[in-house]
Amino acid sequence: MAQETSVEQAYALAQAQYAAWGVDTEKALLALGNIPISMHCWQGDDVGGFETAGAELSGGGIQATGNYPGKARTITELRADFAKAHDLIPGQHRINLHASYLDNGGSYVERNAITPEHFQTWIEWAQSNGLGIDFNSTYFSHAK
């Protein structure tokens, strides 16, 4: 209860400061609710991807974590993190997947051999959760 009151008080102060600049924060929040945000896959697993179990970037990652000790370790855990974020962030959003986040069924696939079929489970999951998907090829930390 005290935390909620503190947040409400902080928002009221911020709202007054923005109003002094002619900004209606309630209108801004309503507009923001109509702007899709693309949540990047690497925010939940420190850019490891799912090419190989326990993958890490050569040179390290960015220390982003999800709802698991260290980082999401599986596609299931990363999807759960995406779903939780989607529940907490108002509006309709998208996920952004790099090629290294393919669902390879446990078999290694070279990046130059990845096909759309490697993302079918992601497509089905996103559709069932009302999310769009943006795609990035992965041209770093890999020879091919």
Where on the chain are the PLM-derived regions?
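Alpha/beta catalytic barrel-like cores
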Residues: 2-144
